[in-house]
């Protein structure tokens, strides 16, 4: 009797009932949609921005960082940190997930035969490095993210750095990276689903509750397009306190800093400091839909006072995963110089949500 009690305690984790829901099998769908539709149209713009600011950049750290989340997830049980559903189930799910990822990614690479940006081979789509990194990040999140949110944040941070490295090294197009991330996430979820079949137990849940009271570092990356046709790469880092606002959703507040790198050679990089507010709606306890509003001040190049600008935006996001969200943003910037061409702009992209603390 005592042995059974110990086994149950080690094999399960108490699940709170006051959390919003996430849809893991559907979480990768926006990435696949972007990779198939919007991203191919932006591939050349992303490459042009990369070639303008980092033309000679060559790094090799992404060859090693890609394995960090998977290696950590596999080694933690040996260090005495029990995964969410026990060691046997843990390694079964990982074995299936790795096998599915290998077959799926390698098969797609040679079936599609897309040429790399460097032109040296025809196995660009999808990115294998990115798939490996996001496979490990999702497995780490599934096994330990419930109890150790910092581990989940570490996994997705290193996976995102790997994706960045593949683009900065001119090894992949943007759509390759998005498809690789989706392949890794879906492979991890499929591995857990197959482990359920092997062990004849229902442990992997399609709809899973997630903490919505947290200190969140929100790192958004996306392509910006103005209505006059210019393209830019936008990056913003926001620190938010996100708290449940009741049964219907969440609210939050914080600050952010951002930068934009333009494709145009005559346009200087710009930056901004903003006050950010966030509100989210729980849509049928399946996924969250929210807005992110910002107002702030920024500058351009080396003369921020002469070219200071005030602006704001409203972002509409869809989040089916606790570690990242998809967003669509529309905004306007105002500037003292009335001759400046500052029309409305729109952005679309992905934001990584790193939970520093959760409760």
Language model: regions and residue ranges:
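Alpha-helical transmembrane segments that form the membrane-embedded catalytic/substrate-binding core
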Residues: 126-136, 172-195
């Amino acid at each position: 009797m005592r042995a059974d009690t110990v086994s149950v305690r080690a094999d399960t984790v108490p699940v709170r009932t006051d959390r919003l829901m996430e849809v893991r099998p559907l979480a990768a769908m926006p990435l696949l949609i972007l990779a198939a539709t919007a991203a191919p149209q932006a591939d050349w713009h992303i490459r042009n921005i990369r070639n303008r600011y980092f033309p000679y950049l060559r790094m090799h750290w992404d060859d090693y960082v890609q394995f960090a989340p998977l290696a950590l997830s596999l080694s933690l049980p040996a260090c005495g940190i029990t995964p969410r559903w026990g060691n046997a189930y843990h390694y079964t799910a990982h074995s299936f997930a790795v096998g599915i990822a290998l077959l799926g990614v390698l098969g797609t690479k040679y079936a599609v035969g897309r040429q790399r940006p460097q032109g040296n081979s025809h196995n660009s789509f999808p990115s294998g490095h990115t798939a490996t990194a996001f496979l490990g990040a999702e497995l780490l999140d599934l096994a330990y993210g419930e109890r150790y949110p910092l581990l989940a944040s570490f996994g997705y941070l290193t996976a995102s750095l790997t994706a960045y490295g593949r683009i900065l090294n001119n090894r992949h197009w943007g759509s390759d990276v998005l498809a690789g991330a989706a392949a890794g996430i879906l492979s991890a979820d499929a591995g857990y689903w197959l482990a359920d079949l092997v062990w004849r137990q229902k442990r992997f849940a399609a709809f899973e509750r997630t903490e919505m009271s947290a200190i969140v570092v929100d790192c958004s990356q996306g392509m910006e397009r103005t209505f006059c046709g210019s393209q830019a790469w936008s990056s913003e880092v926001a620190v938010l306190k996100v708290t449940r606002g009741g049964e219907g959703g969440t609210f939050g507040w914080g600050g952010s800093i951002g930068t934009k790198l333009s494709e145009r050679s005559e346009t200087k990089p710009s930056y901004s400091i903003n006050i950010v507010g966030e509100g989210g709606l729980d849509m049928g306890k399946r996924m969250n839909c929210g807005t992110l509003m910002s107002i702030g001040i920024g500058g351009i190049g080396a003369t921020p006072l002469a070219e200071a600008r005030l602006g704001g935006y409203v972002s509409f996001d869809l989040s089916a995963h606790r570690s990242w969200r998809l967003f669509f943003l529309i905004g306007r910037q105002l500037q003292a110089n009335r001759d400046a061409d500052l029309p409305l702009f729109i952005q679309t992209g992905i934001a990584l949500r790193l939970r520093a603390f959760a409760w």
